[in-house]
Swiss-Prot record:
Binding sites annotated in the UniProt record for S-adenosyl-L-methionine: 84, 89, 136-137, 155
Similarity comment text for this entry: Belongs to the methyltransferase superfamily. RNA methyltransferase RsmG family.
Function: Specifically methylates the N7 position of a guanine in 16S rRNA.
Domain of life, per lineage: Bacteria
Name the record gives this protein: Ribosomal RNA small subunit methyltransferase G
PANTHER family, sorted: S-ADENOSYL-L-METHIONINE-DEPENDENT METHYLTRANSFERASES SUPERFAMILY PROTEIN
Matching InterPro entries: rRNA_ssu_MeTfrase_G, SAM-dependent_MTases_sf
GO cellular component, one term: cytosol
Keywords annotated in UniProt: Cytoplasm, Methyltransferase, rRNA processing, S-adenosyl-L-methionine, Transferase
Pfam family, one: GidB
Length: 254
């Protein structure tokens, strides 16, 4: 009888698939994160992905696999922002895996950011994790955030053109935006490329994997700036979602 996999309890199969192995302290932090998520989920509806494979694959693995390159240099100093962090993913998992990285986690729902901030402090990440309660259209126009991040990421937030408008203005020179997606089509790519034109950015890479244990297809889109993003982006709150770039007659404005 074949040996059962260990995807449900952070066993070696999980890390072998990921190509990264947490040290003892990091594994302890990830397990504590699961316990904290259980606690807060009983008070605030953060996520249903808390137990067994749903936590270790759909949360931890899915947060970290797009960072294959960054995981090779975990102590390198970086600034990273997680937009629409929700229950703290991918941001908190990234903070654990990349100890040299400072994280900004943004969400517009105060009860969620309160829970995420409490979890970050309990995990000993408070000095590296800054939690902001605001719309990302506001974040992207603030001097303290705009054009300052090496990595800007968003998982399951909105359509690709909308997410691109959220993330690109946050990027420092040579920074990259990471879009965590599921299925990806030629139409998705065409729409995104059109949206990137007024943002002065380009599609740098597209990578796909199947999550372990049949948990589904995932796509990583990396975007990089080719010139400073025009100050008119992101547009005011709500406009990126109502009038996505790539579908407008005035996309060529700068």
């Amino acid at each position: 009888m074949p040996e059962a996999n260990t995807f449900s309890d952070a066993g070696p199969d999980l890390w072998q698939c990921l190509g990264w192995q947490p040290n003892e302290n990091q594994l302890s932090q990830l397990k504590e994160l699961q316990a904290l998520l259980r606690h807060w989920n009983s008070r605030v509806n953060l996520t249903r992905l808390v137990e067994n494979e749903e936590f270790w694959i759909a949360q931890v693995f899915d947060s970290l696999w797009p960072l294959e390159k960054e995981l090779r240099t975990p102590d390198l100093t970086r600034r990273c922002i997680d937009v629409g962090t929700g229950g703290g993913f991918p941001g908190l998992a990234v903070a654990i895996a990349l100890p040299g990285t400072s994280l900004t986690l943004v969400d517009s729902v105060g009860r969620k950011t309160a829970a995420v901030e409490s979890m970050a402090n309990a995990l000993g990440l408070g000095t590296r994790v800054d939690v902001r309660t605001e719309r990302v259209e506001v974040t992207g126009q603030k001097r303290s955030c705009r054009g300052t991040f090496d990595l800007a990421m968003a998982r399951a937030v909105a359509t690709p053109p909308v997410v691109a408008e959220y993330l690109v203005p946050l990027l420092a020179h040579q920074g990259q935006a990471l879009l965590y997606r599921g299925h990806w089509s030629n139409d998705d790519e065409a729409n995104l490329k059109r949206a990137l034109v007024p943002l002065k950015a380009k599609l740098a890479d597209c990578k796909q994997i199947n999550l372990p244990a049949g948990r589904g297809l995932r796509t990583l889109i990396r975007i990089e700036s080719i010139a400073p993003c025009p100050k008119s982006y992101p547009r005011p709150v709500g406009l990126p979602n109502r009038l996505p770039l790539g579908n407008q007659a005035d996309d060529k404005r700068s």
